[in-house]
Amino acid sequence: MPYEEIDGVPIWHEEHGDPAGPPLVALHGGIVTFHGSFGDVLTWLSDGRRVIGVELQGHGHTPDTGRPMSIERFADDVAELIDRVVGSGPVDVWGFSLGALTATSLALRHPAKVRRLVLAGSNIRPDGYHPEITAPEQDDPRLPNEEEFAAWQADYEAFAPNSADFLPFLERMQPVVHDLAGWTADEIRSISAPTLLVVGDRDFVRLDHAAEMLDLFPDCRLAVLPATRHTEVMQRADQLRVLVGPFLS
């Protein structure tokens, strides 16, 4: 089975594409699975690359063992997985939402492991989100709808070792993202990896915050996808291929 026991958590990972190709670590969004985030882009992304899809603690096939969860722990888990599966690195890292926060932390805590960063639907501070995201109203169009939420729950119940624990896990995950202190301007300026930011124009992330991130990351590009909500960013496969493919190459 494709698990690595890291700090008491069996971390699921799976590989796609060319085993001899340049390695890319793919980090999914919160509550969802690797395929739930990267399924629409995997065909072209794995063409000529070694794609390593990771499922973080409590997500997909990886159990929630009760270990305290944080973005920093997730990043350290990924760093150890890179050492075991790839070697010392560096690797390209593409993270979406929770995965992008994890990728940012990875680049800060383990800079030698990261060659290039793709950060989709990400912020660097809690105030980078529109305020209704962390204090949501039921009818806000930026938020996941009932159909999307039901699909996430169905995936959880299909793959999770703790398949009946979706709602308790949801409660455990809330503070991991919403209570994140974020990073200072100087910390972000210290990231040397070339970075591509991708957000939707109807994302959780405020566009002025995305522009601030563009200014802070030393070697950075920003793409804004039109008519795109947060949950739709990774579904824009053709647009992402045009944006991400050349950047990684």
How should each PLM-predicted stretch be described?
Residues 191, 197-199:
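Short beta-strand/loop motif that positions the catalytic acidic residue
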Residues 39, 43-46, 52-94:
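Active-site loop/oxyanion-hole signature of alpha/beta-hydrolase fold enzymes
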Residues 101-109, 114-152:
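Flexible "cap/lid" loop of the alpha/beta hydrolase fold
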Residues 228-237, 241:
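Catalytic histidine-centered segment of alpha/beta-hydrolase-like enzymes
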Residues 204-209:
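Conserved alpha/beta-hydrolase "acid-adjacent" motif
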Residues 214-231:
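Catalytic histidine neighborhood in serine/cysteine hydrolases
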Residues 159-186, 202:
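Hydrophobic, aromatic-rich cap/lid helix
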Residues 9-63:
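Conserved HGGG/HGGXW glycine-rich cap/lid loop of the alpha/beta-hydrolase fold
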